[in-house]
């Protein structure tokens, strides 16, 4: 009996080992790809949220192609639509001009893929067999190697590199065998510790932000989504505030834990008790579908309405605030007054640090090591991987109607937010 059990054990081990070898090595081998002499140059590439985007150009002799696209080649072509135009003989192209659109990475099968430019030409001799030409993509950026961690459901690591026989961008997808836990979503309960946030009457912001954040977290986890809170009750001493930067800072945690989305939960305040309603703040140059869904879900299922605020408004309840020219000047003047070294703040920088500093260069992050002792350092400020981040102002603490909603409809409010996030993630899966 022991011999039989031992034999079965060996068979199981060999089977598992064989599958591991197949998945990680044999399956990853890709048939030879023939590339043309001309090479495309990639001037920018990044991953924002869970979408890959690239910008590049190429000068090819024969521009009479019928179609032009990118393709991920692994023995078969996985075509990716692009937008292109010709400028001075060169062809410029990009996947999307929206930072949270592009190639969705998480559902790529395990294996090795080569990203190339693909031109299709008519075949005068055989109309049924068009002529296909492939062009390698030279990585002209400073990001020579990028490592992306997928959603926990897939639990893969994607390494984007250009050190291969084709000298083109290569995507290697493997199982994530790391013991370090990564997260899908980061939720940041606004303020905390001695910083109670906005206050009015008997209430302050932190009377609501932590409870709502934890309820959203619970709802997401029930749906199989892993969630990291930037801080929990008791994490911040009542005589201290949470660091924004450095290791474990609230604007650094999202990239430390490799999350794809960040939601910062706040309650607004106005000098007028008549101002009320929700304001969802976003990055610029995005697809606003998720923001719209959050706003519509909240206004349809709770007593919170759209804010009457018109400043930085993009749509009902949705706002995008990048630094204006005057705000850039004011920031620089402020650095001089405090004797700080200047940061590279521009009109491409989002004004809200939880959106800006979690999004890498795509959202204009700038907190480098210029003032480490006074401000801290965001080690991911210049990263080409960033969280898709939103700041939710869930009504006004200075308005009695909104406060009553925050007290009486908190579960419904949390569900409205979490339902939108679940929908966003599941639709992409």
Describe each model-derived feature in a short phrase:
Residues 1-13:
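N-terminal Sec-pathway targeting helices
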Residues 15-24, 424, 428:
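Short hydrophobic alpha-helical membrane-anchoring segments
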Residues 18-175:
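Basic, ligand-binding patches in group-transfer machinery
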Residues 52-58, 68-72, 82, 91-95, ...:
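Hydrophobic beta-strand residues in large extracellular and virion-surface proteins
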Residues 168-185, 189:
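Boundary/activation segment at the start of structured domains
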Residues 182-202:
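Short glycine-rich His-centered loop
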Residues 195-205, 388, 399-401:
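Cell-wall polysaccharide-cleaving catalytic domain and substrate-binding groove, primarily
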Residues 210-429:
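Active-site-proximal helix/loop segments of hydrolytic enzymes
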């Amino acid at each position: 009996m022991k011999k039989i059990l031992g034999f079965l054990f060996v068979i199981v081990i060999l089977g598992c080992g064989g599958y591991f070898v197949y998945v990680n090595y044999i399956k990853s081998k890709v048939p030879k790809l023939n590339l043309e002499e001309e090479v495309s140059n990639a001037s920018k590439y990044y991953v924002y949220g869970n979408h890959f985007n690239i910008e590049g150009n190429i000068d090819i002799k024969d521009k009479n192609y019928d179609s032009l696209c990118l393709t991920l080649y692994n023995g078969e072509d996985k075509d990716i639509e692009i937008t292109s135009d010709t400028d001075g003989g060169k062809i410029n192209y990009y996947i999307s001009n929206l930072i949270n659109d592009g190639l969705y990475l998480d559902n790529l099968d395990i294996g090795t893929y080569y990203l190339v430019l693909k031109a299709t030409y008519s075949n005068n001799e055989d109309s049924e067999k068009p002529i296909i030409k492939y062009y390698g993509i030279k990585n002209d950026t400073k990001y020579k190697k990028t490592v992306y961690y997928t959603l926990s459901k897939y639990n893969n690591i994607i390494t984007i590199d250009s050190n291969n026989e084709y000298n083109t961008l290569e995507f290697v997808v493997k199982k994530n065998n790391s013991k370090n836990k990564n997260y899908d979503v980061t939720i940041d309960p606004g303020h905390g510790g001695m910083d109670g946030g906005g206050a009015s009457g008997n209430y302050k912001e932190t009377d609501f932000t932590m409870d709502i954040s934890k309820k959203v977290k619970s709802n997401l986890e029930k749906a199989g989504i892993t969630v990291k809170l930037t801080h929990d009750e008791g994490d911040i001493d009542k005589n201290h505030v949470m660091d924004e930067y450095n290791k474990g800072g609230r604007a650094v945690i999202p990239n430390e834990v490799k999350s794809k989305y960040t939601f910062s939960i706040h309650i607004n305040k106005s000098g007028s008790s008549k101002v009320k309603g929700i304001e969802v703040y976003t990055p610029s140059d995005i697809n606003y579908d998720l923001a719209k869904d959050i706003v519509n879900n909240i206004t349809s299922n709770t007593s919170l309405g759209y804010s009457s605020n018109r400043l930085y408004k993009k749509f009902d309840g949705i706002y995008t605030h990048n630094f204006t020219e005057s705000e850039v000047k004011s920031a620089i003047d402020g650095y001089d007054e405090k004797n700080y070294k200047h940061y590279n703040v521009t009109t491409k920088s989002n004004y809200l640090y939880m959106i800006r500093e979690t999004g890498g260069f795509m959202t204009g992050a700038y907190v480098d090591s210029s003032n480490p002792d006074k401000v801290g350092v965001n080690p991911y400020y210049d990263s080409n991987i960033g969280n898709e981040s939103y700041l939710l102002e869930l009504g006004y603490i200075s308005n009695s109607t909104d406060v009553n909603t925050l007290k009486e409809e908190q579960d419904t409010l949390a569900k409205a937010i979490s339902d939108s996030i679940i929908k966003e993630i599941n639709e992409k899966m």
